[in-house]
Each structure stands twice: as structure tokens, then as C-alpha cells.
Amino acid sequence: MVQSLELLLDEGSESALRGSWDALAAAGLPSLASHTSETNRPHVTVAAAEEGLDGALDAVRAVVAGWGLGTGGLAAVVGSPVLFGGAKQRWVLARQIVPSRPLLTLHAAVHRALSEHAPEAEVDPQTTPDGWTAHVTLSRRMPADRLAEALAVVDPEPIPFRFTGLRFWDSPSKTVTDL
């Protein structure tokens, strides 16, 4: 099971990304539209671990308090489609988040708080400052032979947006906590 810290997007960009989920599903392709849990929404994972992140929530909350996520947000841009993985000929299709100095600074600050206040958490190296590619997932387990079709369905136009919040996802309890 996994715990994660996830940046949330403004309503307009979330709607546009859900539109990509829906377009993939309408084309008969794997899509996160099929994941109908009320907690499922477009997000950018900034940290993930099997356990232990909950020990640093107060510290993370203090870090993000100064970033105005609840009052105007941090400006960012959803960029081009990107592919991850390829294990067993299955791919993750996502949209890259164009990295900016403020986003990278916030990400590093969250990880400093985690290392100081939850040192026992074994953070996934793909979410650490040295291994992170900021992205919003559109589809998991995309078959290799359908990649061209999927890329043709996804609108690649940049989407300017604002990060408006950070949440903690706890998969064992299937709960989210807004930070």
C-alpha cells in the first residue's frame, strides 16, 4: 500500500485533463476515467512511500502554508504528452508539467520536511528531487501497440494553470487529507 503527497490543480485544468481521460475511454483505450472513486482526480505526486509520510504532515503543512496554494496558487503549465515505463509492453501515458524554479523549490522544501520529520519513510526515488518528473497521469497499462492511437487522441496543447492545494493520500484507509 502507498501513501503520497499530491499537488492539486485548478478547476479549469482539472476539467481539461478529465476531458483527456474521457477521450481515451471513448476511443476504447485504457484511461483513468475508469477509476471512479471520489478521491480520483488529476494531480501531481510530489512524494510517495509505502508508509511513514503521515509522520511529517504538520511539517509539510507548514512548508506549503507560505506558497498561497489555497489563495491563488502556484502558476504552472501542463506540457506535452510523455510516456513512462514499458515493462511488459505496457506504458503510462501522462502530460508533463513544465518545471519551473518555484515548483522545483516547493518540491525540494517538501522533501526536506520529509527527511527531517519522517526519516523512516522510504520515499520512492522517482519522487525525490533527483528523480522526479512532474506529470499528471492519463492512463496506466497502455499497450505498446496502441500508443500511436492514444497519442493521437490526447490534445497536446499547453494548459496554463495554478496549483491550488496539496493533499495526503493514504491508500490503506482510502482517505485524503487536505493540507
Feature annotation, model-predicted:
Residues W67, G85-G86:
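Short, charge-rich binding segments
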Residues P160-T164, W169, T175-L179:
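Glycine-rich, aromatic-bearing surface loops/beta-hairpins
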Residues T71-G73, R90, F163:
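Sequence-level motif detector for i,i+2 pairs with an aromatic at +2
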Residues M1-V77, P102-I159, D178-L179:
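Basic, often amphipathic N-terminal segments
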